[in-house]
Amino acid sequence: YTLSLHDALPIWANNMETKSIMIVGVGGQGTLLASRILGAALISNGFDVKVSEVHGMSQRGGSVVTYVKYGSKVNSPIVNEGEADLILAFEQLEAARWLQYLKKDGTLIINTQKIDPMSVIIGNSIYPDGVLDAINKAGAKTTNLDALSLAVSAGSAKAVNVVLIGVMASHMDLNRDVWINAIKNTVPEKFLEMNLKAFDLGYNYNK
């Protein structure tokens, strides 16, 4: 789908090159809510934004990837190999699966949580060892964190997605208030306080 405020681009963004972000994880982790928060934050800042969601298996356990591209004018939502400026990975095996899409100078944020894929659950394979070591050897600018424990400390394991949005926000040139407003406009009110706490735990993770 396409989000756009055609005449609301800030002056500094009029000729901004297109940036590409990928949000990757497995079904049930809240990746789609995360992409909605990201899209809302970007569009409120005046960018042309295109979002494309791809579900390998949208039920719990299947790989889910969302492409988000933004700039002064975006033609296609699809991100090709070697084009992503940032990859937000909700699970370490998914980070490895999509690593080739990252630019050489791109940023990779990884939730170190392990979620067994269906092939492991049914006994056809085992979860590989050394995933994070292999990723780190690839030379990407990587932030590894246990987002699950931060989410639990915020009040719910389900807040992993907003913790990770907070970490991503700390790597981007958008004002914190833009993110807070995007969360307020996206998350149900009864979960708002918990999610704002989760966002700040992520946002301040490296500070």
State each model region's role.
Residues 13-207:
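Active-site cofactor/cluster-binding pocket
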Residues 2-9:
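Short, small-residue-biased leader/transition segments that mark boundaries at the very start
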Residues 1-2, 137:
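Long, charged N-terminal interaction/targeting segments
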